[in-house]
Design a protein with these regions (language model features):
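Short helical (or helix-break) motifs at transmembrane helix termini and adjacent helical loops
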Residues: 227-246, 268-271, 275
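Helix-loop junctions and hydrophobic alpha-helical segments within the transmembrane domains
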Residues: 246-273
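Single conserved hydrophobic/aromatic residue that forms the stacking wall/gate
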Residues: 1-6, 10, 300
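Transmembrane helices with small-residue packing motifs
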Residues: 8, 13-43, 47, 53-55, ...
Length: 302
């Protein structure tokens, strides 16, 4: 029996390698617009802009206190960034040697405010594509500290960086709090670590299977691990308490565990079915983020 249990552990550990590869290779989608129904005006307009005009994402660069000739040079550098289609500034309409003060007020006000000026950048890729986010990063590295990149694509890039930075932090906090709570209320301090190790391996295995979905939302990625930890930890605690009760009735620990599993099976299955049913209900939302979250969540729990 011991050799069989050890074999199962080794098999799980071996599966962690492809699971980690799958988790790393799963694309994370940060564009909430892609989950909108295709017949909404916003989506239709974006498709027309991309298909008929060859322009998808756009951003603005706000530049403070820079000489017009330096702005023109910066504009030229940005125009050579991959997937930048067009960079608009006032020198597209008037020579940069012409003082800004004598420009028509409509033209001046369109690009300037106080000592700040604005560049409008159009990309040939969609708002949240990987190519667009790489272009935003490249533009920021070129622009310098006195320049600020804004717009939806810049916000998506910031969101991506923020999520990647903070996700390990709040997952770690969830694990720490769960561990502390179990150590306080359980009579064995080793048990919480055993539970966390087992559930942690299950989470990694399930995250790897997301590769077969092609991509998942950043919200789904952020929530799925914590949800699985919370739900499956409850089932583990149910089983542990039942096992502790049965040990007082049966001398053989294996027999006590078998009885404990039988006693908790009905409640665990009933609880898991209602949980899975709730996740399946999300799949019927017209906003297909629900489908993404529901699919990942119920596959992780089943």
């Amino acid at each position: 029996v011991r050799s069989s249990a050890a074999s199962d552990v080794y098999k799980r550990q071996a599966l962690l390698v492809p699971s980690l590869i799958g988790m790393i290779m799963t694309r994370i989608n940060y564009d909430m617009l892609t989950y909108l129904p295709g017949d909404i005006d916003t989506v239709v307009g974006q498709d027309i802009l991309m298909d008929e005009f060859g322009k998808g994402a756009f951003s603005f660069v706000i530049i403070e206190g820079m000489d017009p000739k330096d702005v023109s040079s910066l504009r030229e550098d940005i125009s050579h960034v991959d997937h930048v289609d067009t960079v608009l500034w006032y020198d597209d309409f008037a020579d940069v040697s012409v003082p800004m003060e004598i420009l028509p007020s409509k033209l001046y006000d369109a690009f300037n405010s106080g000592d700040s000026t604005m560049l409008a950048i159009f990309f040939d890729t969609s708002t949240s594509s990987d190519d667009t986010m790489e272009a935003i990063t490249a533009i920021r590295s070129i622009a310098g500290k006195q320049c600020f990149v804004s717009g939806m694509s810049a916000m998506v890039t910031d969101l991506k960086d923020l999520c990647e930075k903070e996700e390990p932090i709040y997952v770690g906090i969830a694990v720490a709090l769960a561990c502390v709570a179990m150590m306080i209320f359980m009579d064995n301090w080793i048990t919480p670590f055993v539970f966390l190790m087992s559930i942690g391996m299950a989470i990694l295995l399930n995250m790897g299977t997301n590769y077969f979905l092609g991509e998942i939302s950043y919200l789904t990625k952020a929530l799925s691990a914590v949800l699985q930890l919370a739900v499956t930890m409850d089932y583990s605690i149910f089983l542990w308490h039942s096992y502790e009760e049965q040990k007082s009735m049966y001398e053989d620990n294996k027999e006590a565990m078998a009885v404990a599993i039988n006693n908790t099976l009905t409640s665990v299955v009933g609880s898991s079915i209602t949980t899975v049913a709730g996740f399946i209900a999300l799949c019927f939302m017209s906003y297909t983020l629900g489908l993404d979250l529901g699919t990942v969540s119920y596959t992780h729990l089943t």
